[in-house]
């Protein structure tokens, strides 16, 4: 049986079973204790099966911790609606449907190393590196005379993701993107 943990002892990054046996990743939590009542733990969690992020409240609850497996794998190619990844140690391959990678697919390019998250034999998703270099497929022309501080223009990456970039970025440039928010960070320097 898995280890039980008191709600007030939850820490960011832990995985637990939710009230309906969903697998939840703790993103944030706060513990509020009042003099006359039992403390309340407000917890922001991500459902690893659906990707939904919600706030839950626990009182003196004991929660079951979930032991998830993490494995480093490299992206090989896209096969229809599936992304194919390979373990560099044993060369085994897995396919993950793009529905499980709604946000992540915007930043998955050839040879990127990701961490595949599984529970027993169920694939829950992938963790990307914090920063990834990606080529710009198309960038609007810079507006002549627009020298305002932080002037931006639209660009599209080779993955199809669109974002705002500085005026000096051109089609074919490689840029660094933060995968947590999808924002431009810097021009890629080899």
UniProtKB/Swiss-Prot annotation:
Superkingdom of this protein's organism: Bacteria
This protein's GO CC annotations: cytoplasm
An individual GO BP term: peptide biosynthetic process
Molecular-function annotations in GO: translation elongation factor activity
Pfam name, any one: EFP_N
Record keywords: Cytoplasm, Elongation factor, Protein biosynthesis
Biochemical pathway: Protein biosynthesis; polypeptide chain elongation
Subcellular localization(s) per the UniProt record: Cytoplasm
Chief site of localization: cytoplasm
Keyword Protein biosynthesis: yes
Family membership noted in the UniProt record: Belongs to the elongation factor P family.
Function text: Involved in peptide bond synthesis. Stimulates efficient translation and peptide-bond synthesis on native or reconstituted 70S ribosomes in vitro. Probably functions indirectly by altering the affinity of the ribosome for aminoacyl-tRNA, thus increasing their reactivity as acceptors for peptidyl transferase.
NCBIfam families to which the protein is assigned, alphabetical: efp, PRK00529.1
Protein name: Elongation factor P
